[in-house]
């Protein structure tokens, strides 16, 4: 397998280079090659150097000293059995040869530099006691311990919600300025690349297809692949169907001597099978038809229709409450979802979104409050009829699908459970695979033989097997590449339109909500703070928390004024009063902490929960 093929890039002192592309494009392989961590793989390069030193021979000596690295999942980076303090101090003890006292003192200072409050206290904590954003800051502190000149960042914010992600990006910008750091940032989020990078290199199936200044490449993309990535990107300022890139990456065991994007390119023509080198000086592109297609738009699919506001109510919650010990995970939530409607639910990690979704399905018992489905009250132990009509699609298909069962067995179980197959299970499985745009042959495949997007399609097919009226989608696209994500989102919109499904779509990606949802509810500390039509809420947010969330979303080509919230992410005011009072930048006085805020109508169907009059927001 030739994972990288004639890839050239350089990172200038104090600059940031972005590497973008789908999973399998070679981004992480490039990072591991620079670190000398590819094991037995053969690395051939005309030149691979850092400050004049040959990385083919010196990478192990430079790694952890002059070159630092931060990876995607801090939970796998950090040792769960060792305190944070010892892990941050370790590179100082091993590489800098400091005494334990000096290393401990510097490690505490590093945690403070990465924006962690109470750094001295955190030194004694274990990783499981920290949030995802805090763990990533610890990983950054470890990478900075030996004062590296180059920091390699492999998807450092992928698993984080939008405000935590914005905080990490602010931190990286500050570190680059203070320490004159050079950064190599790998990400599939083009908004992050646009915000943080000076230059960008686009990789496809191991080859560079476009490279140049980030503003030029993202504002005037010239290669069809880059244009396809941008067309598939969910944006706050754009609604309607997304335009996923058709097909899949080529087989790297059989490299195509010509354009390897040709089978997926809507602009491919005779001659594209010939080899082509990068052309251009400052803005380089590898495409035979770059001038011919400059004025052609990327094909856009038709938008699916949205639900009618006159549709009947399907699901209604009234005052749902769920506590875990002293934590009020869901606190008095009342919502309505109509037939065929998509309600988006957004908020930071830990705000209660997933708990609310499970309460709506009676997968968790509510401490109080009522749930009605199709006008009938749903008991704590629901009947099989409710289970058939209300289903869920989970975030991670790797844990949701049984690795020992093939796709046919996975789909057959709900058919038998609800007595729907009636002796025609094979035909019904074929119908379900067709619904989610998978070929019939996939029935014999096992989960490990599927891509991430294909696994999620199987998860959706399983939810559809019982012919439900309502599905909870709990972060179903958060782990997917932008193009695969676009295809899954379009599929859900299509299924909603053709089958009349109602969806509760839970996500921390507000751009995704903008494309799929009819209405959106914003959640914080177990309560809904704002609710209304998605176009209205996202274009004219009234609640201070919603405004802060939207300001944190990185948007290609836009520079919104960031509203930085004080306090720790997810800090909740206990007892009576506004849950957001501890972090609210517009807090008006003691009333915010001493009285529950009222619901106020900002417009027909658009309401907020706040003490501040709507005309002042």
Annotated model-derived regions:
Residues 145-149, 465-469:
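A short, proline-enriched helix->beta-strand linker immediately N-terminal to the Walker B motif
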Residues 35, 361:
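Helix-to-loop junction immediately C-terminal to a conserved catalytic motif
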Residues 43-54, 369-377, 386:
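Conserved ABC transporter NBD signature motif
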Residues 54-68, 86, 94, 215-221, ...:
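ABC ATPase NBD coupling module
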Residues 22, 36, 156, 160-241, ...:
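P-loop NTP-binding/switch modules centered on Walker-like glycine-rich loops
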Residues 120, 213-314, 533-617:
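Charged, flexible cofactor/metal-binding loops and thiol motifs
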């Amino acid at each position: 397998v030739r994972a990288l093929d004639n890839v050239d890039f350089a990172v200038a002192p104090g600059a940031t280079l972005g590497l973008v592309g789908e999973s399998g494009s070679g981004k992480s392989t490039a990072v591991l090659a620079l670190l000398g961590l590819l094991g037995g793989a053969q690395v051939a390069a005309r030149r691979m150097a850092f400050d004049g030193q040959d990385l083919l021979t010196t990478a192990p000596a430079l790694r952890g000293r002059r070159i630092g690295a931060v990876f995607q999942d801090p939970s796998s980076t950090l040792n769960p059995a060792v305190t944070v303090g010892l892990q941050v101090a370790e590179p100082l003890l091993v590489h800098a040869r400091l005494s334990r006292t000096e290393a401990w003192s510097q490690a505490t200072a590093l945690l403070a530099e990465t924006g962690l409050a109470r750094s001295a206290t955190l030194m004694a904590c274990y990783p499981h006691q920290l949030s995802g954003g805090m763990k990533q800051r610890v990983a950054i502190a470890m990478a900075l311990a030996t004062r590296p000149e180059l920091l390699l960042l492999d998807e450092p914010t992928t698993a984080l919600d939008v405000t935590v992600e914005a905080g990490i990006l602010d931190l990286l910008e500050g570190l680059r300025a203070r320490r004159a750091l050079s950064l190599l940032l790998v990400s599939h989020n083009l908004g992050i690349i646009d915000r943080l990078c000076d230059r960008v290199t686009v990789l496809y199936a191991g080859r560079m297809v476009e490279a140049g200044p980030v503003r030029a490449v993202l504002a005037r993309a010239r290669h069809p692949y880059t244009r396809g990535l941008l067309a598939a990107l969910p944006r706050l300022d754009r609604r309607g169907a997304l335009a996923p890139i058709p097909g899949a990456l080529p087989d790297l065991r059989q490299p195509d001597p010509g354009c390897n994007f040709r089978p997926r390119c809507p602009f491919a023509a005779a001659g594209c099978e010939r080899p082509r080198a990068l052309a251009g000086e400052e803005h380089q592109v590898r495409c035979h038809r770059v001038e011919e297609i400059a004025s052609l738009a990327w094909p856009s699919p038709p938008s699916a229709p949205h639900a009618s506001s006159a549709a009947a109510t399907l699901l209604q919650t009234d005052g749902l409450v769920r506590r875990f010990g002293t934590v009020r995970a869901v606190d008095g939530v009342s919502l309505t979802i109509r037939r065929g409607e998509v309600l988006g639910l957004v908020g930071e990690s830990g705000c209660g979104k997933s708990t609310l979704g499970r309460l709506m399905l009676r997968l968790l018992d509510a401490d109080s409050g009522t749930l009605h489905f199709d006008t009938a009250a749903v008991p704590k132990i629901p009947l099989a009829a409710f289970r058939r009509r209300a289903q869920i699609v989970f975030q991670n298909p790797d844990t949701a699908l049984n690795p020992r069962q093939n796709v046919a067995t996975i789909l057959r179980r709900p058919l038998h459970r609800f007595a729907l197959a009636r002796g025609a299970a094979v035909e019904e499985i074929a119908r379900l695979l067709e619904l989610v745009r998978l070929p019939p042959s996939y029935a014999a495949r096992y989960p490990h033989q599927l891509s991430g997007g294909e696994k999620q399609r199987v998860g959706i097919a399983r939810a559809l097997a019982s012919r439900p009226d309502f599905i909870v989608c709990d972060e179903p696209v958060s782990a997917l590449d932008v193009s695969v994500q676009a295809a899954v989102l379009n599929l859900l919109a299509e299924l909603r339109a053709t089958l009349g499904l109602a969806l509760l779509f839970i996500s921390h990606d507000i751009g995704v909500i903008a494309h799929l949802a009819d209405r959106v509810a914003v959640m914080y500390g177990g309560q809904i703070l704002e609710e209304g039509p998605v176009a209205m809420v996202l274009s004219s947010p009234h609640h201070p928390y919603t405004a802060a969330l939207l300001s944190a979303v990185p948007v290609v080509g836009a520079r919104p004024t960031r509203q930085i919230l004080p306090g720790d992410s997810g800090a909740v005011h206990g007892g009576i009063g506004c849950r957001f009072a501890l972090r609210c930048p517009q807090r008006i006085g003691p009333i915010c902490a001493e009285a529950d805020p009222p619901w106020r109508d900002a417009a027909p169907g658009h309401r907020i929960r706040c003490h501040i009059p709507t005309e002042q927001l």
